[in-house]
Design a protein with these regions (language model features):
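N-terminal Rossmann-like FAD-binding beta1-loop-alpha1 element of flavoenzymes
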Residues: 1-17, 156, 162-172
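Glycine-rich flavin
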Residues: 6-150, 183-187
Length: 191
């Protein structure tokens, strides 16, 4: 959505972006980018743990989940700011909230109507929570990035790449992990 609005504005179109959450979408806020920060921390932890196998005499004095979360969140906020500045620079109006279609050329948000010849819909995705007993005690992959404390133990349910990546991050940073899969192995659609 942001790239489309910025590109259209660069060609002279009058554009607006309506966003109910933080700018940048799923990838920047609760997907690719924060996951890569966590994955890099996990890889660093793994390297430190195996350093003695390569002749290094180091001691590891612990890991601070809160510090990593704080730095990761600050990095994401910086990216949100960059996106806001780019919209402003390109004269794309940023409207906080969500809208509904009235007809093919009209949307409404908070009682105000906006008309346009064309709309680009880039809604992103949301995790689906199963309708099973106890589901309220779990978190989605989005919730992983909201954890204020590092859990001592987790059960990650899923066999796809997101579940396997998050299980790997937890494990490398010292959390005891159980990966629960429906089939006979993880990443079955990727092997």
């Amino acid at each position: 959505g942001l790239a489309g609005a910025n590109r259209a504005a660069s060609y002279g179109a009058k554009c607006a972006v309506i966003e109910q959450a933080r700018l940048g979408g799923t990838c920047v806020n609760v997907g690719c980018v924060p996951k890569k920060v966590m994955w890099f921390a996990a890889a660093t932890a793994d390297t430190l743990q195996s350093a003695q196998n390569y002749g290094f005499d180091i001691s590891i004095n612990g890991f601070n989940w809160n510090e990593l979360k704080h730095k990761r969140d600050a990095y994401i906020e910086r990216l949100n700011g960059i996106y806001a500045n780019n919209l402003n620079k390109n004269k794309v109006e940023h409207i906080q909230g969500s809208a509904s279609f009235i007809d093919a050329h009209t949307i409404e948000m908070a009682g105000k109507r906006y008309t346009a010849e064309r709309f680009l819909i880039a809604t992103g995705g949301q995790p689906s929570i199963p309708n099973i007993p106890g589901a309220q005690f779990g978190i989605s992959s989005d919730g992983f990035f909201e954890l204020e404390q590092q859990p001592k133990k987790v059960a990650v349910i899923g066999a796809g790449f997101i579940a396997v990546e998050l299980a790997g991050v937890f494990q490398a940073l010292g959390t005891q992990v159980s990966l629960i899969v429906r089939g006979d192995h993880a990443l079955r659609q990727f092997d």
